[in-house]
Amino acid sequence: MGASEHVPPITSKAEFQEKVLNAKGFVVVDCFATWCGPCKAIAPTVEKFAQTYTDASFYQIDVDELSEVAAELGIRAMPTFLLFKDGQKVSDVVGANPGALEAGIKALLA
């Protein structure tokens, strides 16, 4: 995996609070694990979406590094994409499904 400039990592609970829960606007959170093959497979697509849908902020959470946050969010499978508007989760997409993720992002920004 590895973070990119378009999909930076969130590395603490406080940072998650600041960048996601306290954020105004649209946020997409990619919950992944370094050992997750499908997470690696969809990573370039997530990067592309982050560059395409610039009205949303994109972040990554390593569920093993931030297990407490992942548990609070109810993450049970990777990848899981959480879509937030003004700090409230409005939907999620479970699995490495580019079509479903793009549809979710478009609905979020509509």
Curated annotation (Swiss-Prot):
The record marks 30 as: Deprotonates C-terminal active site Cys. Keywords: Disulfide bond, Electron transport, Redox-active center, Transport. The record marks 37-38 as: Contributes to redox potential value. Residues 2-110 form the Thioredoxin domain. Disulfide bonds join 36-39. The active site is at 36 (nucleophile), 39 (nucleophile). It comes from the Eukaryota. GO terms for molecular function: protein-disulfide reductase activity. InterPro entries: Thioredoxin, Thioredoxin-like_sf, Thioredoxin_CS, Thioredoxin_domain. Belongs to the thioredoxin family. Participates in various redox reactions through the reversible oxidation of its active center dithiol to a disulfide and catalyzes dithiol-disulfide exchange reactions. This is Thioredoxin. The gene is TRX1.
